[in-house]
Each structure stands twice: as structure tokens, then as C-alpha cells.
Amino acid sequence: MAVTFPPKISPTLMTPDPHFIPGYSGFCPQYRYSLGKTYGQLTSHLLTNPDIRRSGHLVLQSNPFPPAPRGHSYNEASQELGGRRRRQRLGDPKLTISMIPGYTGFIPRSQKFFAKTYAETSWDALSDFHNEQQMQESQRQEMLLTSKLQEGRQPQTEHEKQLLTARHRTPLPALSKEPAPFMSLRGFQPQGSPYYMEEENPNKYFISGYTGYVPRSRFLIGNGYPITTNRAMVEFAHMNQKKGVRFSDQQGHNEGDNLHTEQGQIYLEELGLLPRYTGYVPGYKFQFGNTFGRLTQNALGQSTLQKQTVN
């Protein structure tokens, strides 16, 4: 008895076209309002039902590549974007007009375009990038031509030979290898520290941005920094005059003298160091029970053995 088999393509087993296969993530009209069948049978019924309004194309963008802009063709675009000139300039032949969706590589200037399909966005981005590269190349050629003309390496045309020419070419040769530097007779002359200037001197102030400490400046407000520092130094000088202290007598500073006196000693014998001094003080780690200034007083005048005993 002969055994009969069903045909390989049976309408019972195969879903008739058109239909979508499971996993399709695109839009299907009226799919969210239908149920009771498999995905293939349900989409086949929705796509063939004349009562359901739908598009005439199963895929809205039937052409995988966007239409070329007006005045261009794919042959011209292929020569521009995929031709020899582009590969020599960019060095990457992967960027063509037929960019497939899902490409994870970098496409120059693609972040500037949106609200279009992937192929259209890639087309616009590559066209914009190619135009920018051509502009930069033309600027580079123009700079090379200018350099050749200035150095005399560009051969002259017949028309240029008939023009009036100058006796000298740029750049002009230097007259001396070591020219004498220019010194202005009215140049700025440093006048020394503002602390040692007279009160009537208009330069007795610190410019804005000075981060050093200015005595008495924290108590003056309501004026600009130069005016504040001027008043602070004048007030500080008056306070020292009442105590019998003058900067000019102590430091031996003369107006017009730019040399500052060097202080070779760090540890003063008469005074202690200010708090938060981070340098080394001999014998300080063996002392305790007094202020920092008292413990660091006369650091060089006492030996380590003497400083172990607190006065």
C-alpha cells in the first residue's frame, strides 16, 4: 500500500502572503485591537482586509537608499563621496552613499541632522562633511600658492611677465644678524615697593589682583582696591610713626634704589615665628607648654640641650 504525504507547501501549514513574521517591530494597522490568532495569520488578515485603511506599501520606505537631491545623481554622488579623491582625503572607504541602518561606526556631522531616515541622515551628513573638506582643501591650496608667490617659486605666466614688478621680494633680507634692541627713553621705571613711597606719591597702592597681605586693608570697605590699599598703607604708616618705627630707617631704603636688602637669617633672635610656619625649627619638637611664638623665640641662640628645658 502506497504511503501518501501532504504537499510541501500547504495552505493549512503555510500562512498566505502578505504577512509579518514574529519579531517584526514595525507598525501594523489595527493590530493592537485584534486577538485570537497567531501573529502571522492575524497580520495576514489585517493586511488583506479591505475594510481596514492602510498604506499601499508594506514598508513605508520601499527604497533602501534616499533619492538624490535635485541637480545630482547617484553616479555623481558616488564619484564625490566614494571616489578616489574622497579616499585619498579621508582614508576610509566605508563611508558611502549606501549606508545601511544598523551601522555602528562614526559618521561625521550626523548629529546635526534629525527627523529623517537613517539613509537620508547619512546622505546629508556625508554631503556636508565632504563640502567642508573641499573648502578646507581649497584654502590649503590658496595658502600654498601664496607662499610660493612670496618666495618666488611659482613660475610666472606670460601676462604676469608683462606687469610692472618690484625690485624686492618678500620676505626682505635682514640687515643685521644681531640687531640692537630698542630701548625707550621714556619707558617704565620701577619705583620700588609701595610701602616705602611717600604719601603724596600717586603710585602708592597695589593693583587689583594682588593677593599679598596688606596691613589694615580688611578694615576699609566701600572703595576700589587701589584706593583701599593706599589708605591702608597710609594708616599703617601713621600707626608705626606713633610707635617710633619708620620703614625707611629700618630697611635703609632710598628712593630710586631697586636693590632689596637680603635677609640671611630666618630665625630672629628677638621675635618668635608666626603660627602656621611650616619650616623646620631646631629643637621645637622637644618643647611644649607655651605658645608657638614663645617656643620658637631665639631658635638659633640656644642649643638643642638648652631648648629641652622650657624657661
Swiss-Prot record:
GO terms for cellular component: axonemal microtubule. Residues 64-93, 150-183 are annotated as: Disordered. InterPro entries: CMI2A-C-like_dom. The keyword Cytoplasm applies. The keyword Cytoplasm applies. Keywords: Cell projection, Cytoplasm, Cytoskeleton. It is found in: Cytoplasm, Cytoskeleton, Cilium axoneme. Expressed in airway epithelial cells. Belongs to the CIMIP2 family. Microtubule inner protein (MIP) part of the dynein-decorated doublet microtubules (DMTs) in cilia axoneme, which is required for motile cilia beating. This is Ciliary microtubule inner protein 2B. It comes from Xenopus laevis (African clawed frog).
